[in-house]
Amino acid sequence: TGCSPKNYALTSQPVTDIKYGLSPLITKKDLSDIAGVTLYDVVISYKKSKVKGNVLFSHVGLTGPGIINLSNEISESISYNLLEKDPEIDLEIAIDLCPELTHQDLTDKFNRDFQAKGKTLIKNYLKLFLTNSFIEYFLNESGIDADTQLSRINKKSKNRLIENLKRFTFKICSFNSKLSKVTIGGVDLKHVNPKTMESKLIPNLYFAGETLNLHGPTGGYNLRIAFCTGYLAGLSASWK
C-alpha cells in the first residue's frame, strides 16, 4: 500500500493523472491537544461530497475511515498530477457532530433544555452530543467557558454552539502523503483488456493492482482489486 508516482513511465502506456488516495489530511491548526480523540459516526463534508464515518485526531491533522474516504473525493476534485508536482491545497471541510438531528431539531432541543436545566454546566450538557475528551476543545473553539451554566449562556453564544455542532470546520493545507494508502490514477483502462488484463497496445504486457486506474474506499476493496486483477493477469499470461 502507499502512493508513489514513480515507475509509471515504465508502463509504456497512456497514464491518467496520479493522485493521493485514502490519505489522512493535515490541518493548518495544531491538533496535538486532542491527538488520539475519536469522533464516532459523524458526517464529514467537502463542497457537495459527504461521507459518514469515524474521525481520529492526530498530532498533525485528521485521519480515520471517514476522513480517508473523503480524501478521495477531495483529491479527485483538485487538478494536479504527482508525475509533475505535489498539489497546493487550501480548503475547508466541515464535520456534522450530530448528524441524527437536523439544525431545527437541535435548536428546539437547546431551547427546551436551556430553560429546564438552567443550572447544568455546559461541559456536562454537551455529553449528550459529544465524546467527553472532545468537549473542552469544542468549547474553547466556540469561545465559551466550560463551567458556564446553561441559564447564563446568551442567545448569540447558544446559536454558535448549535452551528458548531452541525458544522465544525477545519482548514486543510495538505494530504499526509507518507500515510496515503492507495494511488488514484494509473494506466488508462480503455487500453487494457478487462478479460485478461493484457495491454491493447503492447502484446504480452499485463497490468494489475494499482498500476491501473482503479481504486475504491477503505475496507479491503483495494486489496480485492489487486488480488483479482493479479490473479487474472497471471492466469492469462500462463495461457500463452
What kind of feature is each model-predicted range?
Residues G2-C3, N124-Y125, F134, C173-S174, ...:
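Domain-scale detector for complete catalytic domains at protein termini or as standalone homologs
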Residues E136-H215:
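A glycine-rich dinucleotide-binding beta-alpha-beta segment and adjacent secondary-structure elements
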Residues T1-T11, L214-K240:
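A conserved FAD-binding loop/helix module that cradles the flavin
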Residues S12-Q13, S49, K158, K166-K171, ...:
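Generic secondary-structure signature for well-ordered alpha-helical cores
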Residues T63-G66, V187-D188, T211, T218-N222:
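Gly/Ser/Thr-rich beta-alpha loop segments that engage phosphate groups in nucleotides
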Residues T27-K28, I184, L235:
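Short Asp/Glu-rich motifs
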Residues S75-S77, S142-D147, W239-K240:
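Short helix-capping/linker segments at secondary-structure and domain boundaries
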Residues T1-F134:
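Predominantly flavin-linked oxidoreductase catalytic cores and closely associated redox partners
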